[in-house]
Amino acid sequence: MGFAEWRLRNKYWTIYIVPLVVLLLMIYGTWAYCHKLCYERVYRDFGHKATAIGLICTCCVLDALIIAIWVLIVSCGPGHQPGVAPHLLVDSADLENTTVAPNCYQSDPHGYPVWCSNCQSLKVGRTKHSSHQGHCVPRFDHYCVWLGAVIGFKNYRLFVQFVFYFAVLLMIVWITISVYIRDIRQYHARLNANLIVLLIISGIGWLMTSGLFVSYIYYMSQNLTSIEVIDLKKRKRTPELSMQRLYCYYNSDDHYRYVVKLDNDFKGSVYKKHWLKNIKEFMGSNPMLWFIPLPQYWHESPLANGERDVNTIVSPYQEEVGPHTIDYIKKRIESGEYIHKFKEPGREKTHL
């Protein structure tokens, strides 16, 4: 049995092992930092009592904040896209059991949208089916093995906050140990092994979390998810994968739908807008809340409840295609570079 097969069969065990290791390392690091460094060295040996108490309080507050955000990430979840019925794209389709297609959506060469066979629903926007959650996740970003949680539309901001505050904590720990190393060596011939281990762990962790945080700032500014970044890198190595990027667009000028392929000359995210608006789509419209770990709660229903407008059904998970994408598609249509063209009966029927 290969490792990949073993991991798949034992996923319900492995999803707890790594987060448990991370939690134990946090507990060990807090003990080593607060007791071995702050109390035994800074407080007792050097007599810097106010500094030691301040460092201990800062570490404990950040620890509590990080664990609280972790709990919120898992408890809130990534979100659950409501069920969306097929679009009304053919005359023979049942009007009551279909939905009106948005102006632009990802499709196959014939103009049919992406379908999830597990949820029996359309995948709207950047929705992906998550095997860990058992349902479709809106704006699926990735599965974080360190936290044992799927990151998506609903808990994305919490994840960014988790990475940020973890990076701050590790930075404080690493800098504090580095500053006091010389003074400690004057009192003791050997540096405590726990402090050496903590210095290494905090240094590596700081580089990882700070690098991850900077990367996510860039991803958000470009309106990209982690899975899209991986896909873009694959396309650079294998250009033929660009055949998968097909979008169906309703042209209001002639009232036809066109299926257009986004070639490799199309750069960036389909949803890209102004960089600040991109960040607000991920972090929220209020910058004051970007650093406050508050969960986002709203009513979710796995059923469409008879609603036919897709944007209303998936609200508040609705995502708009960027203006530069629309301009690119229109230019392809004007030059005749499209794959398929058809009349959409759904719009005619809904306007009768």
UniProtKB/Swiss-Prot annotation:
Q: How does it sit in the membrane?
A: Multi-pass membrane protein
What's the superkingdom here? Eukaryota
Which reaction is recorded as catalysed by this protein? Answer: L-cysteinyl-[protein] + hexadecanoyl-CoA = S-hexadecanoyl-L-cysteinyl-[protein] + CoA
Q: Localized where? A: Membrane
Its cellular-component GO annotations read: endoplasmic reticulum; Golgi apparatus; membrane
GO terms in the biological process aspect are: protein targeting to membrane
What Enzyme Commission number does this protein have? 2.3.1.225
Q: Which residues cross the membrane?
A: 12-32, 53-73, 159-179, 195-215
Q: Broadest EC class?
A: transferase
Q: Which residues form the DHHC domain?
A: 114-164
Keywords assigned by UniProt, alphabetized: Acyltransferase, Lipoprotein, Membrane, Palmitate, Transferase, Transmembrane, Transmembrane helix
Q: Which residues form the active site?
A: 144 (s-palmitoyl cysteine intermediate)
GO MF term (any one)? protein-cysteine S-palmitoyltransferase activity
PANTHER family, from UniProt? PALMITOYLTRANSFERASE ZDHHC6 (PTHR22883:SF23), ZINC FINGER DHHC DOMAIN CONTAINING PROTEIN (PTHR22883)
Entry domain remark = The DHHC domain is required for palmitoyltransferase activity.
* Protein family: Belongs to the DHHC palmitoyltransferase family. PFA5 subfamily.
Q: What is this protein called?
A: Palmitoyltransferase PFA5
Q: What is the lineage of its organism?
A: Eukaryota, Fungi, Dikarya, Ascomycota, Saccharomycotina
Name of the gene? PFA5
